[in-house]
């Protein structure tokens, strides 16, 4: 099974899925359009969240970063007048330094991730969507900013006028992702932001054409008219999509077979049938590992019946 993932929502699902599906049968394709260089090192937030989850190091209170991390280096730099744009933990920074050193040695992003998977003893295949640079740029009333500036510096407060992925047309799907897609027919789109997390992955040239030939199941990150977490609603509105599970189906309608809704969602199934999308309702609000496991079992069953 191939899982398309961002840094929120999908990691919680993956936490349960790896207990249901053997790790060596899972490939996680991760968004890299939110990556940014900070203090001389490449930060890959979504990839790092997956790495920390699978290595048992994630801070489960925040669902990002390393548990029990400290921030002495960040504080010391601030005291010395270096305005580091992101608050980076000391243990988290180790990963960034190791990856950036590998990149400076000439390794690709996917090759650097392979090295980190080995170091952390991770059996799941984790891949970047592309080895090329793609940047999510958010337009607000005060101008265009990188996604991290919008989300970290501006706390996601400004109105979003538009969202674009800079460099997406020139980027190529990672060759290892293409290999995985050639050998696996099941693609699970996790409950991550459809515009800034999943959007870059499916917007890579040629990806939609490939997905039309696959069994594609998506888990909605929207319950009712609200995102479970993060700024998905703002970005969907900026792109002209309804902030609803129907809007999620609309984002993926070109290739989507089944959309998994939360059982609290009251959207009429007929609205999806008109789009050629089947729906399955279950508990998608993963407040515990057991709920994540139950959802994962349901997803495995859905794929078996497509």
UniProtKB/Swiss-Prot annotation:
Keywords: Magnesium, Transferase. 7,8-didemethyl-8-hydroxy-5-deazariboflavin binds at residue 48. GO terms for molecular function: LPPG:FO 2-phospho-L-lactate transferase activity; magnesium ion binding. It catalyses: (2S)-lactyl-2-diphospho-5'-guanosine + 7,8-didemethyl-8-hydroxy-5-deazariboflavin = oxidized coenzyme F420-0 + GMP + H(+). Catalyzes the transfer of the 2-phospholactate moiety from (2S)-lactyl-2-diphospho-5'-guanosine to 7,8-didemethyl-8-hydroxy-5-deazariboflavin (FO) with the formation of oxidized coenzyme F420-0 and GMP. Belongs to the CofD family. This is 2-phospho-L-lactate transferase. It comes from Methanococcoides burtonii (strain DSM 6242 / NBRC 107633 / OCM 468 / ACE-M). The lineage of its organism: Archaea, Methanobacteriati, Methanobacteriota, Stenosarchaea group, Methanomicrobia.
């Amino acid at each position: 099974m191939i899982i398309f993932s961002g840094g929120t929502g999908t990691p919680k699902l993956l936490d349960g899925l790896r207990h249901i599906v053997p790790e060596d049968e899972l490939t996680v394709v991760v968004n890299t359009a939110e990556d940014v260089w900070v203090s001389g090192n490449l930060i890959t937030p979504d990839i790092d969240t997956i790495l920390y989850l699978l290595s048992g190091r994630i801070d489960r209170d925040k669902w990002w970063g390393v548990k029990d991390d400290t921030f002495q280096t960040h504080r010391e730099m601030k005291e010395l007048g270096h305005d580091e744009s992101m608050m980076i933990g000391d243990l988290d920074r180790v990963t960034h330094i190791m990856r950036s050193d590998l990149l400076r040695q000439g390794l690709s992003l996917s090759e650097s991730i392979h090295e980190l998977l080995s170091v952390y003893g991770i059996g799941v295949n984790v891949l970047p969507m592309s080895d090329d640079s793609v940047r999510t740029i958010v337009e607000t009333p005060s101008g265009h900013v990188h996604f991290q500036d919008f989300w970290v510096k501006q706390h996601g407060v400004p109105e979003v006028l538009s969202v674009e992925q800079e460099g997406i047309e020139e980027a190529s799907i990672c060759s290892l992702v293409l290999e995985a897609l050639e050998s696996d027919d099941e693609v699970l789109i996790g409950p991550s932001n459809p515009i800034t997390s999943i959007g870059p992955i499916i917007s890579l040239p040629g990806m939609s054409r490939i997905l039309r030939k696959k069994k594609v199941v998506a888990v909605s990150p929207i319950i009712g008219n609200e995102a479970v977490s993060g700024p998905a609603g703002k970005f969907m509105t900026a792109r002209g999509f309804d902030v609803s599970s129907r809007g999620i189906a609309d984002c993926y309608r070109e290739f989507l077979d089944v959309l998994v809704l939360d059982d609290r969602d009251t959207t009429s199934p007929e609205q999806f049938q008109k789009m050629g999308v089947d729906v399955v309702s279950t508990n998608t609000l993963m407040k515990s590992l057991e709920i994540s496991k139950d959802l994962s079992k349901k997803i495995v069953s859905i794929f078996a019946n497509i």
